[in-house]
Amino acid sequence: MASLTSGRLHVIGGGLAGSALATLMAEDGVDVTLYDQAEPFESRWTRGMQTSPESHKVSEPEIFYDPEGLVADFFARFPEIPGKLVRPAHGVLGLKRGRRKPAIVTLDEGLAHALVNRRSGPLMRAITAFGLWQKRYASEDSRVELPKGMGHAGIDPDDDRQNPGTYHRDGLAVLAEVLFSMPAHRCSNALLGRVMLPRIKSLLSKNHEPVFSAIDPIILNDIALPTLRDRFIRAGGSVAAWAPLGDIDSTSEYATDLLFGEDTQIVLKPDDAVVLALHPKQLCDAVPDIGFAPAPARRQTMAFEMRRPFAEPRCLFTSDDLVRAIYCNRRHIQVSLSSNVHLPSDGTADQFAHRIWQKCIWLSDQYLNLDLSARAENTNNQGCPKFSFVDAEAPFPELTPGLAALRFRLQPPWKNLFLCGDSFPAEYAPGPAAVFASVKQVRSQLQTFFAV
């Protein structure tokens, strides 16, 4: 590898993406400074359920889509971190339409592979495969079809986008909402197609490992991230905590100054590089010219405490009118609510939670063959386990069609500026896998930058 000691690297944002990238670059021999508005080396996952709803960290599901195993591969390079930090998770798509028999689709071998193979006969499978591949090349104005029965509060029931419902259309709409944390009717077909079918072999081959993974936040926060911090410091990196980014001064081609707080200025040399690994709102405040929409996606979730831990992580995605996803991991379940459900603002929270809990019991028994009621103990007077509501911003923008197209031609305004985070890898759904895909991409770009 070429020498990477020609300039300094300033990584702004000490979350999972910034911390991981800073550690790798420091071990590559680069002089790295990591800045954060609070304490660096913090994750978006929390140790427990009782956390502040104002924090966007609390909304992250512990089970996520990672068909390439990027998260596990990253942490596997550090022998100090237990391998059980990331475990395979069993994924199921459960669909019900009217009086018809429920469709239960196992997703472990791949999303596109599962949707194609549930069809009977080679002709139907070929037609389904071709239809999925077409979506990848659809125009950005083409939206995911919203079948009848999965209506959204903002959609006219007579709208042309309300198509006759089929299990296949239901499945695509459910996956769009789960993967992108946005109403399906606002998601572009091209965006969903690129994520489900990054390559043609996604249709023809199956994954040998489940495409969903589960992370243990306790191991992550208590072992993995402190390990990264220790390695970063030992490699010569420096930490600047409680340093909120104010602005970036520049010429037409290069960023020249970093302004932190009210009175701190960092002058950049011509061979210095800057990486922004920030929440979309902070990113847009720092670099208005990026053209990136600051509005983040939202996640409405509930969490229920369990008495007994789950032997293996599992998740269920469903076309139910209330519940969109159920994530079972450790001693609790996280419930992602449908995009057309609104959390109660009056005194009916207990009744609403009881309704969601009963729905989860029925769905888990129907599609996962799992008895949740036997695992719950700390019930209130209405037979509902201890719960918490979360109505929070996801740590990425809502990838509407125009913004999804922007990701393919997004260029930072200055040659020495790089962007790292969920939002930037064009063929990944926002989430942990996208974070580490972005870390890998930016690391390669930085190695090229410093080697010139």
Question: What does each of the following model-derived ranges do?
Answer:
Residues 7-33:
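N-terminal Rossmann-like FAD-binding beta1-loop-alpha1 element of flavoenzymes
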Residues 17, 40, 281:
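Conserved Rossmann-like nucleotide-cofactor binding loop
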Residues 27-50:
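Glycine-rich FAD pyrophosphate-binding loop
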Residues 28, 243-363, 409:
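Mid-domain catalytic core of redox enzymes
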Residues 48-74:
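N-terminal glycine-rich dinucleotide-binding loop that anchors FAD/FMN and/or NAD(P) in oxidoreductases
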Residues 71-201:
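Mobile amphipathic helical/loop "lid" adjacent to a hydrophobic cofactor/ligand pocket
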Residues 199-260, 264-266:
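Helical element adjacent to the flavin cofactor pocket in flavoenzyme catalytic cores
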